[in-house]
Amino acid sequence: MVEEDLNQIGGNSNYNGEGGDPESNTLNQPLVKANRTLSSTPLALVGAKVSHIESLDYEINENDLFKHDWRKRSKAQVLQYVFLKWTLACLVGLFTGLIATLINLAVENIAGYKLLAVGHFLTQERYVTGLMVLVGANLGLTLVASVLCVCFAPTAAGPGIPEIKAYLNGVDTPNMFGATTMIVKIVGSIGAVAAGLDLGKEGPLVHIGSCIASLLGQGGTDNHRIKWRWLRYFNNDRDRRDLITCGSAAGVCAAFRSPVGGVLFALEEVATWWRSALLWRTFFSTAVVVVVLREFIEICNSGKCGLFGKGGLIMFDVSHVTYTYHVTDIIPVMLIGVIGGILGSLYNHLLHKVLRLYNLINEKGKIHKVLLSLTVSLFTSVCLYGLPFLAKCKPCDPSIDEICPTNGRSGNFKQFHCPKGYYNDLATLLLTTNDDAVRNLFSSNTPNEFGMGSLWIFFVLYCILGLFTFGIATPSGLFLPIILMGAAYGRMLGAAMGSYTSIDQGLYAVLGAAALMAGSMRMTVSLCVIFLELTNNLLLLPITMIVLLIAKTVGDSFNPSIYDIILHLKGLPFLEANPEPWMRNLTVGELGDAKPPVVTLQGVEKVSNIVDVLKNTTHNAFPVLDEAEVPQVGLATGATELHGLILRAHLVKVLKKRWFLTEKRRTEEWEVREKFPWDELAEREDNFDDVAITSAEMEMYVDLHPLTNTTPYTVMENMSVAKALVLFRQVGLRHLLIVPKIQASGMCPVVGILTRQDLRAYNILQAFPLLEKSKGGKTH
């Protein structure tokens, strides 16, 4: 993931936000380390690439240009804006559904023909040839996926969900939603899943849906954007944030054919800000996805999609099965939840260590990333082909309606090397696609289909593969690997209960999968609805709710969710909803004192001063001050007035357009409107290197008043950091000004500026190491 850049970066913390000695606590440090200062240069892993991280501007910049544009908007323009939001939400659902269908078609056909070829050699008892075909095909598919991620789009590696979660929290993740990333994600997902790796396409589909939303919102790629006038309304971070939320919900819906589950996933897991209008649009996007998927299912059921049928869209329909359970079954159901919570937290802990180990390998260079992926693929292929030889052949049950044995790509009873009339239960689970393996485990009224020994082998194998496959340089999802592990242990528990319970083994498998997902991902409501829509059986609702609540509670007592752990490992500055208790013992004024002095500008500033500030600082916003001619109420005579806050990008725009004045004066409103259309200021343009200013221009002036946000959020210097963090996160700020409690003549009206990096727990602990030991320092 990280190459030589890591040697130049430093800091530490574990995934609970606790500081520690770098020598004795190296396993608990972020993969990308920050300098041991409060104002460190923000670096993080985006996908598998080290990137410079900035925050997004979710706050409305209320400068004079925005106010004028807002006042002059007609009803027709407002309707255009509303119509555009709903149209883009529809297009997000449409394209996500189409791409999900394409991925499923490709995976099912590629994997299907591969398994048919292997089965052909098995029937001829050419076992070595069958192994070579399986290994060769899987290595080739893995090579394609890995090379694309390593060489063309490192941000496409992994699930993408942690980066999306960070983006919706206010973190700008560079190159995360580009066209190249999306294409590599699509092709790489097809290759990795068709190669039989223990990966799912659910996480990548969430990322793909978000990429589609981002590209539609900005009118295309960075180099080929549509200059449509209507799209100017979407030229801001707030609307793009909402559209990407729709894209993430559409991705989950496309993965599980779960429209309500997709909306709830976006609400519960990825979105930081939510409101009713966004709820309606995300629901509309998922509804469009379902319509597209339903239409393609009808087409494919007629045999027009090659080997693709109902299988590719993960829909384990058990609506025709009537499950029965009684009060006495609550005890085994609770046991499933407890085991799921313990195993889920253990999986999170071990995966945390494996990702650190993989980081050491990936630091060595691109070739090592590809070799690691190929090694995992080789190990997986050998296990999938070789382990079924350890299982005993089982006789076919003549009372069942299904064909037994089968030699095709799917089916519940694979013959493998068994004689006629017998099947290999372990081959049924291993020599198939991951989707079909889940269907086989979820199958009902088949109490004797899988032996306990085969289930144990399958469970142990997929625990190992689930740990060592995630983290390689391919697109990957965590949903399906966890479902496979959970379904296996759930079915084993059902078989062990035997006649002591009335619950079907297939239902135990469903509950086991739900419990392990809740134990690892710590979601409840969205997972409950996803599993109900997945199985199409409302009878599962009561016991599914119990299992999810117990598993999440048990898991929370050990460690954070898997996505929170990955967020920390990547160094993404995600702000949690609940501040640390010790943050109430520190004021924002004390935090501001630990930073370098604040850099301010005058309302009418000299060009040379602006150039000097831009060259010598990396700040992205500067307070604009004015000498108060008429003292305001409560303002001391001769005190300086805070006019507002101006962004670095706007200063660069001023210099590039050379909007200079020969004399020091305030400009008229019409002068600014002629030079700066409001929608232009929404574009980020902070590259100052190519701006050439002459010596004569250096002596000119710039009136910053029209471009200044006159209503920035401010807090008193005696406010606690905990309270400031809650405000910063809930409002979606990029900068928060600290103002003094008492204004006096000659005193600067701004004590400091807080940014996202300043409010991160382990950054604060580097500057105030004794805070954690203070009263309330530990969470009880």
Curated annotation (Swiss-Prot):
Cellular component per GO, a single term: plant-type vacuole membrane
Bilayer topology annotation: Multi-pass membrane protein
Transmembrane segments: 87-107, 130-150, 177-197, 205-225, 247-267, 277-297, 327-347, 370-390, 452-472, 477-497, 509-529, 530-550, 735-755
Matches recorded under SUPFAM superfamilies: CBS-domain pair (SSF54631), Clc chloride channel (SSF81340)
Alphabetically ordered keywords of this record: CBS domain, Chloride, Chloride channel, Ion channel, Ion transport, Membrane, Repeat, Transmembrane, Transmembrane helix, Transport, Voltage-gated channel
Cross-referenced PROSITE patterns: CBS
Annotated spans, Disordered: 1-28
A molecular-function term among this protein's GO annotations: voltage-gated chloride channel activity
SMART domains noted in UniProt: CBS
Tissue: Broadly expressed in the plant.
Family per similarity comment: Belongs to the chloride channel (TC 2.A.49) family.
Protein name as catalogued: Chloride channel protein CLC-b
